[in-house]
């Protein structure tokens, strides 16, 4: 009789000398190098640890259960005109040299300090960036400024309170936010910005690092905040701020909510400290959740309507014969194409009247009536309606 033979002592046995089947329980830790030939169909339920790359695709005929929902709100992007397409004011290059905000394009406003520390800003067109960017806002420093501790220099957008209700900011159950944008600068290093509430007593400074003159897609996740007051009506819900070089008094610790007015992060670079330095941005998106999704592309008509809630300019001269109320008082109703946020401030310009002058009366978010106070019955004019935050 032969003694028991251990399979561990058998080597170099030709496959043709092996017959029968091997129980599944006898197979373990089988390396991929030991497999060859055609494999039988595999049940996917038995596979674990199988990764899928971003270039791969999966076909399914069943139901997919997602582990997280990015957002159930449409549109996702709370930023309006994030691709810098709409410029109803038709502003060209603006010189920013005071705290009075100026609009290089719709919904975006910039402020600064004195003329000795000024910079310019403009909406620009880009032939090719390789990142789907066709328009941007471009800041250019006019000198190497000596920034004071209390100076504020920024580019920002104010988001209406109604549009942030989905976030439940300042409450238990507050949602995270995902901020993304495409940016480049001639100044390499760590740049910064901030998210602020209306009262500017809650701020979240953020940072992003750039290589000089190279476009970068930036993604930032902003954690929930369960304290502070956040407007959820027609006022300012949030400010999204990009810092151009504010002073130390308006900078704070990055990547946390601070109970202060922070325009940027402590230690970040300042565009204004370098003469001729440039900074450009486009594709700005702020959405609910912990995932930065691809930039939400809107039809230009949709984007225009969203912008018109805050600013409208009727650049073609209106020609109207007035309805005769009495001998010296003539009125004509004018309706806005889009209901505005609040009753706007009206500017009636390029007037050509038969009689005295025209004025906007009975102004509401829906329109106004044009009044010709005089003996004439014909008037021509253009109007500008402003209901910015």
Description of each model-found segment:
Residues 1-76, 287-295:
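Intrinsic low-complexity, repeat-rich intrinsically disordered segments enriched
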Residues 68-389:
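Extracellular and organelle-lumenal recognition/adhesion modules and their flexible linkers in secreted
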């Amino acid at each position: 009789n032969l003694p028991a033979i251990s399979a561990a002592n058998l080597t170099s046995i030709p496959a043709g000398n092996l017959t029968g089947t091997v129980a599944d329980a006898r197979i373990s830790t089988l390396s991929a190098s030991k497999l060859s030939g055609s494999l039988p169909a595999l049940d996917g339920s038995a596979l674990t640890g199988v990764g899928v790359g971003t270039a791969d695709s999966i076909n399914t005929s069943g139901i997919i259960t997602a582990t997280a929902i990015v957002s159930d709100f449409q549109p996702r992007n709370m930023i309006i005109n994030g691709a810098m397409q709409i410029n109803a004011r038709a502003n060209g290059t603006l010189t920013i040299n005071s705290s009075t905000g100026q609009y290089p394009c719709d919904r975006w406003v910039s402020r600064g300090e004195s003329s000795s520390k000024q910079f310019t800003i403009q909406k620009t067109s880009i032939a090719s960036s390789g990142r789907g960017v066709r328009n941007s806002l471009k800041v250019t420093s006019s000198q190497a400024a000596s920034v004071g501790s209390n100076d504020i220099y920024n580019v920002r957008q104010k988001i209406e309170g109604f549009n942030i209700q989905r976030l439940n900011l300042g409450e238990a159950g507050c949602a995270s936010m995902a901020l993304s944008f495409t940016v480049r600068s001639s100044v390499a290093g760590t740049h910064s910005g901030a998210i602020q509430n209306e009262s500017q007593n809650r701020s979240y400074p953020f940072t992003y690092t750039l290589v000089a003159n190279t476009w970068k897609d930036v993604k930032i996740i902003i954690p929930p905040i369960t304290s502070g007051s956040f407007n959820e009506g027609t006022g300012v819900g949030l400010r999204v701020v990009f810092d151009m070089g504010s002073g130390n008094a308006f900078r704070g610790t990055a990547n946390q909510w601070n109970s202060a007015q922070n325009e940027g992060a402590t230690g970040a670079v300042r565009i204004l400290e370098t003469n001729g330095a440039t900074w450009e941005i486009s594709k700005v998106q702020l959405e609910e959740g912990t995932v930065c999704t691809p930039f939400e592309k809107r039809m230009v008509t949709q984007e225009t309507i969203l912008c018109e809630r805050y600013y409208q300019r009727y650049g073609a001269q209106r020609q109207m014969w007035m309805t005769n109320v009495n001998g010296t008082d003539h009125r004509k109703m004018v309706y806005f194409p889009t209901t505005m946020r609040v009753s706007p401030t009206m500017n009636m310009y390029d007037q050509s009247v038969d009689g005295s002058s025209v004025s906007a009366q009975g102004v509401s978010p829906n329109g106004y009536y044009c009044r010709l106070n005089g003996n004439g019955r014909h008037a021509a004019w253009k109007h500008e309606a402003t209901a910015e935050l």
